[in-house]
Amino acid sequence: MSDNTEYLTGLLSTHIKRTDLQVTKDQISQLVGFVQMIDKWNKTYNLTSVRDVESMLLKHIMDSIVVAQHLSQSHYIDVGTGPGLPGIPLAIMLPETHFTLLDSLGKRVRFMKQVAYELKLDNIQPVQSRVEDYVSPHQLNGVLSRAFASLNDMLNWCQHLIGNDGTFIALKGQLPQQEIDDLPAGFAVTEIVQLQVPELDGDRHLIKIVKS
């Protein structure tokens, strides 16, 4: 670990105290380690446009882990995950939940595999594939989408991934009311949650959708 570990640990702990999240010291250590790995790899592989570690803690870690308390399924697929967002922070928060992390770029998948190795995460499976081409060998019961596509596109591209009892979780900024109104036939919104992220301006919404 680099010499900013103590600084980042303190900063993340302060952010977490402003929420009702229950996060162990080991989990904080893993989350900080993840940020340090993004920062290190970003210099070569351009994994994210966020360049400073302080912003990464907010925009990548806090913005992801506030979702944890709203997930109840056993196996999620995070589509268009990039470097593992929100899937890896959520996997750290929910060690009993399995996450398939799907991205089409090999450099991102290689990074996520290294994260799994270094942080000893056995509940993530990074996969390189386009979402419309992917067929899971496992039973999936939840789809996660963060800044990935419109609701219509997400549902059209991902509906083959889960069964009729599965849940689609779309993470959005401003509430996309027009997208909700234009949902394709056969789908229904069951819950809309306004997420609170300390120190982060702008709206954050979680939208749960099921097959109807």
UniProtKB/Swiss-Prot annotation:
Question: Is rRNA processing among this UniProt entry's keywords?
Answer: yes
User: Family, per the entry?
Assistant: Belongs to the methyltransferase superfamily. RNA methyltransferase RsmG family.
- Just give the chief location class: cytoplasm
- Superkingdom classification of source: Bacteria
Annotated source species = Pseudoalteromonas atlantica (strain T6c / ATCC BAA-1087)
Q: What GO CC terms are in its UniProt record?
A: cytosol
Q: Name one GO molecular function term.
A: rRNA (guanine-N7-)-methyltransferase activity
Keywords associated with the record: Cytoplasm, Methyltransferase, rRNA processing, S-adenosyl-L-methionine, Transferase
Report the locations given in the UniProt record.
Cytoplasm
Q: What is this protein called?
A: Ribosomal RNA small subunit methyltransferase G
| HAMAP family documented for this protein | 16SrRNA_methyltr_G (MF_00074)
EC number, as in UniProt: 2.1.1.170
Q: Which gene encodes it?
A: rsmG
Enzyme class (EC, first level)? transferase
Q: What does this protein do?
A: Specifically methylates the N7 position of guanine in position 527 of 16S rRNA.
Q: Where does S-adenosyl-L-methionine bind?
A: G80, L85, V131, E132, R146
- Which Pfam family is one of those matched by this entry? GidB
List the catalytic activities from the record: guanosine(527) in 16S rRNA + S-adenosyl-L-methionine = N(7)-methylguanosine(527) in 16S rRNA + S-adenosyl-L-homocysteine
